[in-house]
Amino acid sequence: MSASAPEPPRLDLSFVRRGGRTVIDRRLFAWPFVLTRSFHTDGARPDLLSVILQTGSGAVHGEDRLTQRFTLREGAAVSVTTQGATSVHRAEPGARAVEQVQLRVAAGASLDYRPEPRILFPDAALCQVLELDCAADAVALVTDAFTMHDPDGQGRLFRELDSTVIVRRPSQEPLLIDRMQLCDPGTALFKGRRAFGSAVLMLPDMHDRAAIRLRVIDTLAHIDDLYAAASLLPQSVGIGIRLAARELRQLRAGFDAVAALVREIDLGARAAQAPSAAATARPTAA
């Protein structure tokens, strides 16, 4: 699949900051995507809008072509998750499902994008491309994960997983192109682990990213049965994280721990910039 010629978005959301809060100013979606209410529930970040993305099908099928686009305008703050882990079902020989996600994070915006993992069933084939276009003074945490499941308990695996992550600054060439391709993998390849994930963390230049990388490593080291690594991205623009575990719960714990650390860092930076601007808000629906 060419990242330069994606399918038209079946989900297209744009977010803006108005009156001290983030709201949706473009809301377009088609089958299988479903979007209901979004919420302001964070007392420490009353501007943060939480979005729970749902799908009518609850799964990705063999020849699906799904493109999503999320655009955060200047100063917007958004948290995106999904209703639950998404099953990726068998694809006919020669076919594969294709999914593209475009994330655009403008100056001063912050994005916490943590969809639930993919569950790859026997003979599943999935090609996914995630593009993160992030301004230099924006904050973004973007995660991706998968696990494997054979309902018959015979240890059968998926057929193909082709995953690409592209990170760039606005209107610039990519800073990072990270690709993983697994075709007809054998059980021995995974060394007893069945849940795998990665994350990209982008922070403004005011932060010491090398020091934060060490904090990420220390945070993840406290989670039992989780193999984790973190490294600086090219030009030290951010941090790349890899996770492997025997079960999804350990992977989720890792992502949650990183998100909590990012939240702590971001709130601290905001308090330092505007110590008198502390505000609270009652949870409301948007």
UniProtKB/Swiss-Prot annotation:
Signal sequence, start to end: none
Pfam family, one: UreD
GO molecular function: nickel cation binding
Compartments it resides in: Cytoplasm
Domain of life: Bacteria
Gene Ontology CC terms, in alphabetical order: cytoplasm
UniProt keyword Ribosomal protein present: no
Keywords: Chaperone, Cytoplasm, Nickel insertion
InterPro entries the record matches: UreD
Quaternary structure and interacting proteins, as annotated: UreD, UreF and UreG form a complex that acts as a GTP-hydrolysis-dependent molecular chaperone, activating the urease apoprotein by helping to assemble the nickel containing metallocenter of UreC. The UreE protein probably delivers the nickel.
Family per similarity comment: Belongs to the UreD family.
Function summary: Required for maturation of urease via the functional incorporation of the urease nickel metallocenter.
Protein's name in the database: Urease accessory protein UreD 2
Protein source organism: Bradyrhizobium sp. (strain BTAi1 / ATCC BAA-1182)
